[in-house]
Every structure is written in C-alpha cells, then in structure tokens.
Amino acid sequence: MRIGLFAVGRLKSGPEKDLAARYFDRFAKAGPAVGLELARVAEVAESRASNAETRKREEAAMLLKSLADGSILILLDERGKALDSEAFASLLGSYRDQGKRDLTIAIGGADGLDPSLYDRADATLCLGKMTWPHQLVRILIAEQLYRAVTILSGHPYHRV
C-alpha cells in the first residue's frame, strides 16, 4: 500500500526538515518488507485568499485533486481520535490487508481543514490534545509511520 503525506505549507531547510526526511527515509527503506511504501510528500503553498473559509476551501480543493482514485484519506486534526502507536500500526495494517492501494495523510494549514474534508475522510486522528505547528506534525507523523512499520514487522524499535 502506498502512503503519502499532503501538507499545506512548505518546510524550509533546517533541522525540522532534516529530521522529517530521516524518518521518511527509514519508513521508505523498511516499509516494503511489510507491504507499505512511501508514495510522496506533497507540499502545497498556503492559500493567499483574504478570509479563512476561502483559504480552507481552496486548500481542500488542492488536496482532493491530489488524491488517487479510491485513496484512503486520514485527516490530522486536534479534535480527531487519539490512537497509541500500536493502534495506528494496526489501522495501517488493516487498510493494507483490505487491499487498499493508496492512503493519504493530510495536514491542514494554519486555519485548519475545510468541513467538506471530514465527510470524505476515512478517519480523523489527532496527535494528542495539544495544537502542534505543522513542522513538528510532519516529524511526528513521519516517526509514527516508521514506528508502525517496526511494529508490523516485529522489530524491537518499539518497546513498551
């Protein structure tokens, strides 16, 4: 199953980008052994519209346009469901085992996500109750993708 990340906003060069790249690279190398591969990390510029609702609508349109047909869509939102690492790995494994070909994880912009995306989403998850800047969210989700691969493969990286 191909897993991609869609993010509103671009990471500038620096330690955050380097750390996210390190975990995406680990995921890309380890994932194929358990049937998961990194499709792409798509970054789009934040909308320049003058109001938040229009910005969210425009960003949602870019996301929907980038989705492969039949892609699973997981939104990251502070009001989403909190999963521990094992449950996240299980969720990915379950989509893989159902024969799903593509999965996209979406990180919204500063204004959040357009309401229309929640109807289209297969799941809405949070990375805790706190609000995180998108630079850190990328690192967190990249690490959790790598951790999910290690859990699914029985690798000792994930220790409880």
From Swiss-Prot:
Entries under Pfam families matching the protein: SPOUT_MTase
Keywords, sorted A to Z: Cytoplasm, Methyltransferase, rRNA processing, S-adenosyl-L-methionine, Transferase
Keyword NADP: no
Annotated EC: 2.1.1.177
Record's subcellular location: Cytoplasm
GO CC entries: cytoplasm
Gene3D superfamilies noted in UniProt: 3.40.1280.10
Binding, S-adenosyl-L-methionine: L76, G108, L127, G128, K129, M130, T131, W132
HAMAP family xref list: 23SrRNA_methyltr_H (MF_00658)
Recorded family membership: Belongs to the RNA methyltransferase RlmH family.
Function: Specifically methylates the pseudouridine at position 1915 (m3Psi1915) in 23S rRNA.
Assembly, per entry: Homodimer.
Protein name from the UniProt record: Ribosomal RNA large subunit methyltransferase H
Origin species: Rhizobium leguminosarum bv. trifolii (strain WSM2304)
Lineage: Bacteria, Pseudomonadati, Pseudomonadota, Alphaproteobacteria, Hyphomicrobiales
